[in-house]
Amino acid sequence: MALPQGLLTFRDVAIEFSQEEWKCLDPAQRTLYRDVMLENYRNLVSLDISSKCMLKTLSSTGQGNTEVIHTGTLHRQASHHIGEFCFHEIEKDIHGFEFQWKEDETNGHAAPMTEIKELAGSTGQHDQRHAGNKRIKDQLGSSFHLHLPEPHIFQSEGKIGNQVEKSINNASSVSTSQRICCRPKTHISNKYGNNSLHSSLLTQKWEVHMREKSFECIQSFKSFNCSSLLKKHQIIHLEEKQCKCDVCGKVFNQKRYLACHRRCHTGEKPYKCNECGKTFGHNSSLFIHKALHTGEKPYECEECDKVFSRKSHLERHKRIHTGEKPYKCKVCDEAFAYNSYLAKHTILHTGEKPYTCNECGKVFNRLSTLARHHRLHTGEKPYKCEECDKVFSRKSHLERHRRIHSGEKPYKCEECCKVFSRKSNLERHRRIHTGEKPYKCKVCDKAFQRDSHLAQHQRVHTGEKPYKCNECGKTFGQTSSLIIHRRLHTGEKPYKCNECGKTFSQMSSLVYHHRLHSGEKP
């Protein structure tokens, strides 16, 4: 990513200390300072961007109060095609800077020593290959003020980084009357007293200056403030190519996730419960299962104090209080609180019945309905009443039965305030007020309020008599007719007149008898 041409200094990445601050740093912190600044400088040198860097340090020469001022300036003027710049050849040319010493005859001190080197991406053939590109010039200047007897000429054997490292290493012996400054041109002091400093001062300042992230991943465009973090991040992209499931093609960013996923295909379940011996494919599933044995329910609802063994169950339960229904049907826009409810509802639109009974071949649109149907074949009745030990094949039947013992009748008619123990009885009762007769005979168009009444009526047309007396073999079309007939054999007369105490086997006979006492004539 090309940066705009201009001057880039150490301002955002350099650290500045006053003499009081520097005295508070221990040797380890000063060493850290030198390492950080050296690494920073090397990074800037290696970047192919237009930049100017100035490094200015102060150190004691050990010769009285004489001080040495090291000033390093790096000018780099980028070409128009910075991506084509050949830094490999520059690295070769960095060796051998010319040090020129000029003596100031007027004061007897050494005049500024300057090392100047023009660095081009290449010379000769390389310039021809990159015709049209401007030459890239690096000038590394350093000025020293020393009491020297005579001028000297040096030939540098090291690279830029080595020269800077030498300057920074000298910074550990700072004079008490001077300060260390890594700033370009302008001199800004930080006024901190000795009491305000602490051992983490260097670390805190470094974190502030390193907030600017300059290392960017070309794949995900994430930025990092040092190259080591970028390299660590790039491992993720490398593993993305390696962590792919051979069966379904699903990709994972870590190998351990891929290993867990493969158990879905192999059926491997390495995690076993010590209590019941049940095995699981994931350790997290085993952890959740163990809560069934311990009875632990650490997740409590703040609204109703109900507790749950799983956090996901608590989150799902909260929707009861909030009324949230995040799952919406795309066909009819009906919303549901749970994804499982939406899945069941969707089958109503498709008409799909994917669950088949292996015994009778009957199909169902829900797995729970198939499981309930299986109990008809097996005779299983897993739900038992604690009061009378009566058993039921469905939980809803047990709940309904319990109301017999408790006398609870939660369903109330809004018209007449009559109460019922079953919702179905309330719905049936409401038809008395509305006059609704939803069940219609296809033969004679006669309508009925109850489906059982329609079924009985249809036997008039078919002549079917499915109810047979075990005593005499007589058959009947309605079960009520069979019950009345059986009283002929048993002699049972359950209907009694309150006036004279006479009993009857049929209710209709008792009603007819009442007219004798009342004088009513039908």
UniProtKB/Swiss-Prot annotation:
Its main location: nucleus. Isoform 1 and isoform 2 are highly expressed in placenta, pancreas, and small intestine. Lower expression in colon, ovary, testis, prostate, thymus, spleen, kidney, and liver. No expression detected in heart and brain. One of its GO terms (biological process) is regulation of transcription by RNA polymerase II. It comes from the Eukaryota. One of its GO terms (cellular component) is nucleus. GO terms for molecular function: DNA-binding transcription factor activity, RNA polymerase II-specific; RNA polymerase II cis-regulatory region sequence-specific DNA binding; zinc ion binding. Residues 8-80 form the KRAB domain. This is Zinc finger protein 468. It comes from Homo sapiens (Human). The gene is ZNF468.
